[in-house]
């Protein structure tokens, strides 16, 4: 869905919600949760702030939460505290009787938006002309339903940061090359870890409609869409050097959405779940610098007072679009459902959903 069409269907939060006290909003949210009971399910992504996550019935990554939503057959109303592409995935995986809502329709994802379906459809025939029928597309689940549908239509699969290696390996058994979108860093880091040389990777620039490479075309194994996560691209090698200087014994762990240079400079890299599990299992007194979203890092710090934990970039701000989900929007969304006039329902059309689900199903078949 384009930004323009998204804004056209957005109903703005009534101003009186912003005037409410935190105590009153929390009380009214709890009241509706109690009233609706099992008919309501609130999944909350790891990157949500604490004021929202306290009301989540489950926390996790985007795919995990979408699957939990689908498995919760009693829930008629799923209020997804995350961003737009996550709610889309939940809508596609849930049944027709289950309705998915996003408290603030402006909660998008800059990385997902970097892979526009129109640009992707323009790129594909050019890549086919360059490489022939030798490419399997892979899309990160952090992508729009339209991009997932494109991937499914062309025989590809979705990936998560946890299973990207397995899916890249699978894709190479299908065809000679992969087309990875929208996050170039996850694609590059994953392929490199599997032994693909950096010089055998090229970047597709959707703004210029060109393949950026200095290598002969026949050497290219991985085509990376020129997209990135604005949060994780904010971590730099300089940040790792500062930590090494100020905290020599501190281990650095980062998300693979960070650049190759940062991953190389870190001690470890892995998915959100991997980071959480690693810190959970670390001995008391251990020291960590974490390169991922600030709300999650702050939550990990609170959960582990026995460990020294900092953000790799302590001056960094949380994900701005995730932070659009707040108490006023959550309360407004819940009360609109309770009053029988729900706002901000997420609906993916049947044709897009069918093709997108094929890419998700290929991924799930590999797990």
UniProtKB/Swiss-Prot annotation:
Pathway(s) annotated for this protein in UniProt: Cofactor biosynthesis; NAD(+) biosynthesis; quinolinate from iminoaspartate: step 1/1
PANTHER family the record matches: QUINOLINATE SYNTHASE, CHLOROPLASTIC (PTHR30573:SF0), QUINOLINATE SYNTHETASE A (PTHR30573)
A GO-annotated cellular component: cytosol
Entries under InterPro entries matching the protein: NadA (IPR003473), NadA_sf (IPR036094), Quinolinate_synth_A_type3 (IPR023515)
Catalytic reactions on record: iminosuccinate + dihydroxyacetone phosphate = quinolinate + phosphate + 2 H2O + H(+)
Keyword Transferase included in the entry's annotation: yes
Matching HAMAP family: NadA_type3
Cofactor annotation: [4Fe-4S] cluster
Chain positions recorded as [4Fe-4S] cluster binding sites: 109, 229, 319
Gene Ontology MF, one: metal ion binding
Pfam families to which the protein is assigned, alphabetical: NadA
Organism: Lysinibacillus sphaericus (strain C3-41)
Cofactor note: Binds 1 [4Fe-4S] cluster per subunit.
Similarity-based family: Belongs to the quinolinate synthase family. Type 3 subfamily.
Function: Catalyzes the condensation of iminoaspartate with dihydroxyacetone phosphate to form quinolinate.
Gene Ontology BP annotations: 'de novo' NAD biosynthetic process from L-aspartate
UniProt subcellular location: Cytoplasm
Keyword Phosphoprotein included in the entry's annotation: no
Recorded superkingdom: Bacteria
Keywords, ordered alphabetically: 4Fe-4S, Cytoplasm, Iron, Iron-sulfur, Metal-binding, Pyridine nucleotide biosynthesis, Transferase
Residues given in the record as iminosuccinate binding sites: 45, 62, 140-142, 161, 255-257, 272
Protein name listed in UniProt: Quinolinate synthase
The enzyme's E.C. designation: 2.5.1.72
